Amino acid sequence: MTKLFAHRGFASKNIPQNSIASLKRAYEFGFRAIEFDVWFLNKKLILKHDRPAEKEINNLANFRDYFFFGNEFNYWIDFKNLDEKNSENLLEAVKKILDEAAINLDQIYFAPFITDYKIAEKIFIKIRKIFGEKINLIAVCEELKTSADVEILREFLTKNKIKFLSIFHKIIDQDFIKKFSDIEIFAWTVNDLKRLKELENLGVRNFATDKIIPDLKID
């Protein structure tokens, strides 16, 4: 079944991305899956795509806010600055909030935005240590320039037992799908219904979107 993830909530001209308003607007438009960006700054988990200025931090939505609808949603969480130095404090803070909100872990997809596979491997180990081996981990891929890049990614996913991949949708074609047939793809950011249908025909089932609402989707 296809999942449409509201990309940073369902923003509009007057409703900013990664805001409580964009979360609620996503719900109103029928989304039951959401993608959002998280920063760990000043010991706080706050939401914004680009790194916020110090003066912004207290005015932004926080991590807890985005679980307002509890287990009605699936959550694709893009951790923007999760690294080896802050991982323990960040992940413990995340666990505390998820426990308090009683969120089912099988509805959470952890997607640290780390394209250095050596660092990503270390972070995935830390996440599994805290949340268990069954936690949904998403690797991230922005580009694949050469066949060697493809093989490196393939080896990384296999070695680390990663079943999910977040990837720019224009990279995906039939050849790509053949090479990663055992991997569940999370495509971003798909705003054209024709392109979504093309990807569906290739077997892709998870999409981040700014424009396509669930009512327009016919499974």
Q: Where in this protein do the model-derived segments appear?
A:
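Phosphate-group recognition and catalysis centered on beta-loop-alpha active-site segments
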Residues: 1-219
